[in-house]
Design a protein with these regions (language model features):
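Cysteine-centered catalytic environments shared across enzyme families
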Residues: 1-252, 263, 267
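Glycine-rich active-site loop/lid subdomains used to bind and stabilize high-energy intermediates
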Residues: 58-60, 120, 142-143, 221-231, ...
Length: 402
């Protein structure tokens, strides 16, 4: 056969699992059963683009090891009775997402990106620890001679790498298009795909009736410049509210990124227009340090770290006594949205943080103490004072490396 799955099986048969993983390109997750050795192997692609859940459910003779690409599949197992994991709930309320290896359910886990898990059967109730088959750190350490390259060298190499990736992605049995927001990342992906396509590509954009948030004109200008077959959908707050009841069905577990709402709508519009595969600019900010938090923490810490902690605490308290409206009047030409609110947030952090790591984590935390929001959290004797680092999702640790 010629399908991806059949090709994968043929490669494993010829080379074994580890070499096949090393030679693989793209996104995947799979489970493969070795009948001869009673061995089940689960594996996930390098960056975790494809999900893979696994864990234990049931009790007594009904206790079983289960796995699947969606939590909904695991929940369909007849004896599934796993409760909400309250520590995962704390992580969700603090960081707006639940990162691997945790999941919203007790004893159910996400296989981490670039990891594999081997399970010998029959199942004895114990889950072995997953192991990395690929590591981003090893790639970074292997290529540490960056100083000899110029900025233009990096730009040219980046264009070569992106072009190669786009060409690989454009090999498809169905029409291909892009989600075009008009920003740098999606515009770059669209331009490269259009350049390497033999025919006009389709682009899709979501705009908003509220012109404050509407960036559709930028996307339209890019589409016109590139000559794409552009589709624009303008949505209202009512349209967004209509989507919300669908989210629990669409996503396996909660996450608080509001972009999931327009993303669902643009996917629906693309599908209705005959498009089954689309590329987007997601991940650009994470890869290239595009978020403010990456440089705010070191800049702020450099300015306040020389002060003794008690002095920082006192200044933070004094700043909080000044209303946010007054701070807006005092900003004197500083081009920062919601300046007063941000001064208050920073001042609150100054009262507690004692290191740059604590400052970074506090700035990306939605709640200072989410444990207080969860019913019976303390009475169940879960350690409320355990180190904040225990909650840190893997992607946030990677952010810190930037």
């Amino acid at each position: 056969g010629t399908s991806d799955t059949e090709t994968f099986l043929g490669a494993i048969e010829a080379w074994g699992i580890k070499k096949t993983l090393d030679l693989s390109v793209g996104m995947f997750s799979f489970g493969i059963w070795d009948k001869r050795n009673n061995l089940l192997t689960l594996a996930r692609d390098r960056f975790g683009e494809k999900p893979l859940y696994y864990g234990v459910t049931g009790e007594g003779i009904k206790k079983a090891f289960i796995f699947g690409s969606e939590l909904s599949g695991l929940k369909a197992y007849p004896s599934f009775n796993n409760n909400i994991d309250k520590r995962s709930l704390v992580q969700y309320l603090r960081f707006s997402a639940i990162s691997a290896p945790n999941s919203i359910y007790k004893d159910i886990y996400k296989l981490e990106p670039g990891h594999m898990l081997k399970m010998e059967l029959p199942f004895d109730g114990t889950i072995q620890k997953s192991e990395p088959w690929w590591s981003l750190d090893s790639i970074i350490n292997k290529n540490n001679s960056y100083s000899k390259y110029s900025e233009m060298d990096f730009i040219e190499e980046l264009e070569n790498v992106l072009t190669k990736a786009i060409r690989r992605q454009s090999i498809s049995d169905v029409p291909l298009g892009t989600f075009l927001s008009g920003g740098i990342d999606s515009s770059l992906i669209t331009a490269l795909l259009n350049k390497n396509s033999s025919k006009s590509i389709k682009t899709f954009t979501i705009g908003f009736e509220d012109k404050t948030f509407n960036e559709a004109p930028y996307a339209s200008a890019i589409a016109k410049h590139l000559g794409t077959e552009h589709n624009e959908t303008i949505i209202s707050s009512i349209d967004i509210l209509d989507v919300i009841p669908e989210l629990p069905r669409i996503f396996s577990e909660p996450f608080a990124d509001s972009s999931q709402l327009p993303t669902y709508v643009v996917c629906r519009e693309a599908r209705n227009n005959g498009l089954k595969v689309a590329l987007s600019g997601d991940g650009g900010d994470e890869l290239f340090g595009g978020y403010n938090r990456y440089f705010w923490s070191p800049n702020i810490w450099e300015k306040i770290s020389w002060m003794p902690f008690n002095v920082r605490k006192m200044i933070g308290g004094m700043n909080l006594m000044i209303p946010t409206e007054v701070w807006e009047l005092l900003k004197m030409g500083i081009q920062v949205d919601k300046f007063g609110q941000k001064v208050h947030k920073m001042s609150e952090r100054m009262k507690h943080v004692k290191s740059i790591d604590e400052l970074y984590l506090s700035l990306i935390s939605e709640w200072n103490n989410p444990m207080k929001l969860i019913q019976n959290y303390e009475t169940e004797r879960i350690d409320m004072e355990y180190n904040l680092s225990h909650e840190i999702p893997a992607h946030i640790k990677e952010d810190q490396a930037l």
